Amino acid sequence: MVFTFKNKKKKKEASSDKVSKESFNEEDNENNEKREKSDSWYKKIIETKGKSKTKYKNDNSLDDNINEDIINNNNNNNNDNNNDNNNDNNNDNNNDNNNDNNNENNNDNNNFNNYSDEISKNIIHKDNELENQLKDTLKSISSLSNKIVNYESKIEELEKELKEVKDKNIDNNDYENKLKEKEDFVKQKIDMLNEKENLLQEKELDINKREKKINEKEKNIIKKEETFHNIEKEYLEKNKERETISIEIIDIKKHLEKLKIEIKEKKEDLENLNKKLLSKENVLKELKGCVKEKNETINSLNDNIIEKEKKYKLLEYELEEKNKQIDLLNKQEKEKEKEKEREKEKEREKEKEKEYDTLIKELKDEKISILEKVHSIKVREMDIEKREHNFLHMEDQLKDLKNSFVKNNNQLKVYKCEIKNLKTELEKKEKELKDIENVSKEEINKLINQLNEKEKQILAFNKNHKEEIHGLKEELKESVKITKIETQELQEMVDIKQKELDQLQEKYNAQIESISIELSKKEKEYNQYKNTYIEEINNLNEKLEETNKEYTNLQNNYTNEINMLNNDIHMLNGNIKTMNTQISTLKNDVHLLNEQIDKLNNEKGTLNSKISELNVQIMDLKEEKDFLNNQIVDLSNQIDLLTRKMEEKENKMLEQENKYKQEMELLRGNIKSSENILNNDEEVCDLKRKLSLKESEMKMMKEEHDKKLAELKDDCDVRIREMNEKNEDKINMLKEEYEDKINTLKEQNEDKINTLKEQNEDKINTLKEEYEHKINTMKEEYEHKINTLNEQNEHKINTLNEQNEHKINTMKEEYEDKMNTLNEQNEDKMNSLKEEYENKINQINSNNEIKIKDVVNEYIEEVDKLKVTLDEKKKQFDKEINYAHIKAHEKEQILLTEMEELKCQRDNKYSDLYEKYIKLIKSICMIINIECCDDIENEDIIRRIEEYINNNKGLKKEVEEKEHKRHSSFNILKSKEKFFKNSIEDKSHELKKKHEKDLLSKDKEIEEKNKKIKELNNDIKKLQDEILVYKKQSNAQQVDHKKKSWILLKDKSKEKIKDKENQINVEKNEEKDLKKKDDEIRILNEELVKYKTILYNLKKDPLLQNQDLLSKIDINSLTINEGMCVDKIEEHILDYDEEINKSRSNLFQLKNEICSLTTEVMELNNKKNELIEENNKLNLVDQGKKKLKKDVEKQKKEIEKLNKQLTKCNKQIDELNEEVEKLNNENIELITYSNDLNNKFDMKENNLMMKLDENEDNIKKMKSKIDDMEKEIKYREDEKKRNLNEINNLKKKNEDMCIKYNEMNIKYGDICVKYEEMSLTYKETSLKYEQIKVKYDEKCSQYDEIRFQYDEKCFQYDEINKKYGALLNINITNKMVDSKVDRNNNEIISVDNKVEGIANYLKQIFELNEEIIRLKGEINKISLLYSNELNEKNSYDINMKHIQEQLLFLEKTNKENEEKIINLTSQYSDAYKKKSDESKLCGAQFVDDVNIYGNISNNNIRTNEYKYEEMFDTNIEEKNGMHLSKYIHLLEENKFRCMKIIYENENIKSSNKIIGLYNYSRYYGLREDLCKEEIVPSKIGNISNKNENNNKKNNTCDGYDEKVTIVLCIILNEIIKFLFLNDEYVLLFEKIHKNVWKRMYIPEEIKFFILKYITLLNNLRDYIISVHNNMKNEKYDECWFLFQHYFERSSDVRKEMVHFLLERKSQENLISFKSKLKSKKEKILTMDILNFSKEHMQLKTIAHLRKEINYEKLSKDTLNRDYNLLLYKYQECVSKLKRVKNLMKEINQNVFIEKYDDISKELDNFSDGYNEQNEQHVMDPILLNNNKNKNNKLITEHNNPIINRLTNFTQNRDSKYKNKIMDDVKQRKINSTMNNTNKNGINIIYNHYENLNKPNYNDNINRLNSYHQNIHIANSIHPNRNQNKSFLTNQANSTYSVMKNYINSDKPNLNGKKSVRNIFNEIVDENVNKTFVHKSVFF
């Protein structure tokens, strides 16, 4: 979008060029017309005056004067032009004064016109007297005119010649240089634009890549959303299940109701029985018993109710406590989250690019948190369901009690009726009852007891019906049977007793009367109990209703929370997509804002520079004014002198005229006198001219000054308008607030103003007088200066006019040529840029169409999802209609939310009031002239007010004294007023003191409250967000009712406030000025107290407030029928659907608006750039035009000024003086005003920006921190759980491994037994072998004598010998010798037979050796498994410790974070500085403490990475003896460390391994003298064949202490360098001396790790080649980008490199390990090589690291540069791999490879992969236990002649091939070590140092065998190598002698110690009796 700017720029340049050309053409035409007019004037003069031929004597003098005048005029014009150019701010670089020719001609014309006019005037006055003189003058004029014409013609000719010469001789060099400079400038701009285009393209590529990543992440989010929807479906299914359960509960209730009906029927039967029984005599006694029992049951029920109430209260308290605990935990979590977020701000500053990824992760975490909340809500719902069951149980109990109570009342009524009937019957049967009394009492009491027991059972059943539901049927059946039996018995008894009752009636009549009295009493008591019981039941019902309401509230809250969470989920899904759209817009906005900020900074700089320039100009103007004032004084003096001279001359003229009248006849004789007079007239004309010029100059200065002032005024007006527009609203508010105060202050300050006016009037009068005096003096000086200047500057004007004409013509021509060339260049560029721009626009449009389609598709998917969710929610609403009676209580919740909203509004109002009163204080300070900027804190303002009050106490006393003086005359009338005033004043002083103290004490409280207000504001914001959600669900009608009530409260509060304000105003009017301030302070204090009370109330628990509100609300008004609720819910559903449809339409509109706004923003930015360029161009054009216009105006004004008279000068001087005064005053005012405005503007800008930045940044940071801390806490908890699981798994694995270990030990013991048996057989074979070897040596000596005769014949049979084995070669050669040596010697046959016997015997020995090797391999396998298990145990223990340390560290950080959060609000700025300091330290420690694999490194390890020194001198010779301590010293200096084992755990008896610690130090080897001596074998000279026994005298190395184990450690930083194959490190690695290598112990893990890394590089090389071949048509940069992308995301290896390897090597996975050994091509693929994750090997490029450090703008350049560097490094790596392989080849040179004994072959194996199964088959020669047998003994030396013959045989061999034997030995050592690999790589390389004293016994046997087997082969392969024969033979003899001496004398003790091998597979110090397991400080 940037290219639109360029095309328009060039079009505008072309248009401006055309305009400039047209303007110049018009000006040329005007100049030509003016010239023609001037020429016509001269021609007329010549025609009229050409006839006069008389000459005047003074023609020459006149000519000279004229020339001088012309020169002066030219000089003056030059000076004027220079002054004009300086005033125009140096903008005339290419355009000069184009109209100078016209000026010159006009000046000449004007001069001559004036001259002719003056002459004509003199002639008119002197027609009669001076006719002769006029004739002479006419002659002189004509002659002068002719000369002038001639001069002009000559001048024109000369000008033409000059033009021709200049055209020829123009300096082409200057012109070309200028053109080149401009071309270079244009090229630079073009290059800059191209660079910008490239940067834009690069950014577009980066943006596209990021969009791809974002799209991928969105897909992942969509998948997770699907999972979330599935969870929601499951939740709905569970709701369905819940509904089914509820239906079952309803069915159970129905069954219970049926049972209750049955119970009622049975109760009715019982009641019938009771009626029959009550009809008998003892009914009264039964009633008494019933009453007592019922009282007891009531008491028991009351007790139960009380207990349950206590339980409910306890539950309430527990709920409250749990809520408090939850709040505390939430606060703590928030505080912790805040602190952790602050710690993460440092990382976020370095990871701006990852912010978008983190946002998406946060959204995912929020989803997870929401799911957790949903789960918690489900749990709470389960609890609530349980409580519902309990409440239902209690309700059933209460219902049963009510029913029983009603029944009892009915029974009482029946009893009363029956009593009345019985009275009549009892009177009859009293007599009968008396007789039967004794018999019937016992029976009746039994029946009564049975009935009471049944009633108790029924009550108990009603209480515990749920527990006994299953047993009800059985009990009921039993009860029915019992009742039937009882009824039968009762009927029989009734029949018997009816007869007896008749007798008892009479007896009981008397008793009935007494009983009736008692019954009345009991009825009263019963009624009392009844009323109390009813009241208690009502209270219980009320409490139950309250609990039900609370329960419904809780249930509604949970349902609302669920709905909220669902809405939040949908909102988050929408926010994710909106965030993705906003990300792209924000990126563009960031770039645009950065550009705008830069522009604004530049504009600020320009404005500051302009302001400084204006200040300088103002100072210059002041200086110029002073200078002009001085000039005016001088000119006034000159004018006075001229006037005096003119008066004198006039007097003289009068005298002369009188003389001329008298002497007219003598005039012709007195010509000389007349000439003097004419001369005087000429001087006067000159003076007039000078005066006119000075006047013109003064006017020009005045006009320029006016223009500058006008510009300044315009600038000031513009700024004032801007400030007024910004501050209009604020000013209007302040006006309304402060009008009352201003009126009061006016009344206070009227006296002061009057006094000041009087003082100012006096001063003004004095200043006026002084100023008038100065003006008069200035006038006089000005007139004098004008006269002097006119005389000086006449001649200069003419010369300057001529010079300017030449310059103008030359500049025109040059300018035209330049413009033509530039137009041609710009047209070509414009065409090219148009084409490019159109292509790019087409590309952008195509890309935008694709993006728009994607957005539309996404939106359609979202709409479908919303539809699905809506359908689901509709189903939910349909189901929830059944539970409408529960939802009726939602209204209460809505009311609570509204109350909370109103509380928030109230709090906001109080905060607004607080701010208003602070503003009032500030306004008072402004009125009192106290500084109160926004930066100043409230405390400082109050302190300044106190200081002001203290300073003004003296003034108050003075005012009081004056008032007492004024009122002294009215003491009689106003004595009472004085008394009241004194009392009021005393009270005011006391109140002031009190208020001052209160203010000081309350300042601190205000600060604390401000802090709390900030916290409350944050809470209020959160609550507002929640309120918006609740509002959608609330009913409008109820809200309106409550709003009205609250509006009434507000109106009342406002009325109260108004009343108070009216009272305050009345008090203010009554009191005096001094008391008004005190009243204001009081009011402020009162309202501050109110504010504090409000804050204190806000601190209280919201639960109490809610309870108070609930008490006020009528609960009965909230109960509404279920049908109404259903209708309203349906209406809400319809409204909700409409809102959703609206929201969809709004979404479409918003997306369209966002797209349109982005396009408009881009277009506006382009337009802005275009307008800026147009303004720049127009400014240049306008400047040129202004210059031309100014020049034209100046010239016109000069012409007009010449025609004016001297009389106007005086008037102008007066006007100028007045204007100067005005301007001085105006300038002073403008300067002060501008300074004030600038200061205010700057202060307000700074304050606003500071506040905005602080508030916005703090809010954003705090929100982001809170979210991050929540996520981190969850992540930490998950980590804890994972670690615990891992620990448990590790423990289980450890137990399994222990079991396996025990099994392996058993197997190992069995193998050891077998090994001992084999070793015994081996001893026997070795003894036989030695005997045979002695005989063989004798035969060899004989064979050597014969060999010299048959050397030539042996060469013919080389090919045959190659095909067969070593032993067969010996047999064949012997046979060939036998066949051809029969003639010479018969002894050869016997020798051959013996050799064949020896060969057969040796074959048996080799077979035994192979079995021994196989057994050793099995032993090594077992030992490897054991060592791996121990290492795993150690690693588990270390991990446990590490986890415990992390837990402790987290606890400490939590405590520290809590402390930090407390201090955050008060000391945020200090904490931020401390954090910046701590971040540096933490960064440094983090680098030192972290290794490659995340392990903690030791602080003692040095980290100097770039300082290298050579490790050894390259010219060290192996032949000279060197001391090992020197090598160690060099190693210590070059990043190596020597160590010593200082602790050994010798208690472990099961294995021969050391478990201990390393002690390491800087110069450990030198301090302890560990390496005492080392004598390298001295130089071996040429030894003759006769010196056989010299080999026995070879020097051996001195042994070390047996207990010392030296270890060589390489530092971690050096390992990293080795991994990246640093040149210097590789050189160090190669220069290590072999003697050091031989004593070095390298752990197998490190060797395996190095080989893995080398193979990784090989695979990467193959991968690059394959990718490059596949992408033939694309750039190599893109290919490299893919390779770099592999490094950056190592987790996606399967997509890149593994996929490549699997495609090529898929068939090789089926090949077994044995096939690998047979063929080199068949190799196995594994994945271990490629599993270098970011935690283990961070293969990040330099560019990626720089991106993390926010070098986004330079990313492309760094990528290109890093690409080249990585290619270079890659080539170096390849070359270094070759070096390593060459080293391996040198070691393997001339060695016969068996199976996998070659290092280069092992590299090839690793290069394709390493199979984990191969580890079972790999041997570990380092841990070989070759010396386990204890029965071996040393064999003594055998000094037999056979040995001598063998030595002679070896000495006579060809020395060319002896090096092969040494290389063979070395190669075997290397192969045995390199084949031992381990899966786990170790961070630190430990190189084990041990002594090399004696070789291994088995190896020496193998050497001898290989030596004898390969002698003929060596001779046959290299027949032509005969150089250095003697040296090699001696070397070979020496090696053989060493072997022989070892066999004879140094045979190892098999009861001795284990052997340890170095990298060359040589045995290191057999005196070491134990292997070692390294357990170092580094782990």
Curated annotation (Swiss-Prot):
Keywords of the record: Coiled coil, Host cell membrane, Host membrane, Membrane, Merozoite
Location, primary (coarse class): host cell
Coiled-coil annotated spans: 127-366, 412-666, 693-876, 992-1094, 1126-1307, 1398-1467
Biotechnology: Possible candidate for an effective malaria vaccine as determined by epitope response in sera.
GO CC, alphabetical: cytoplasm; host cell plasma membrane; membrane
Compositional bias of kind Basic and acidic residues: 13-24, 31-42
Matching Gene3D superfamilies: 1.10.287.1490
Basic residues: bias regions: 1-12
Superkingdom of the organism of origin: Eukaryota
Subcellular location(s) per record: Host cell membrane
Region of interest: Disordered: 1-42, 54-116
Biased composition (Low complexity): 68-114
PANTHER family linked: ORGANELLAR PROTEIN, PUTATIVE-RELATED-RELATED, VACUOLAR IMPORT AND DEGRADATION PROTEIN 22
Name listed for the protein in its UniProt record: Repetitive organellar protein
Native source species: Plasmodium falciparum (isolate 3D7)
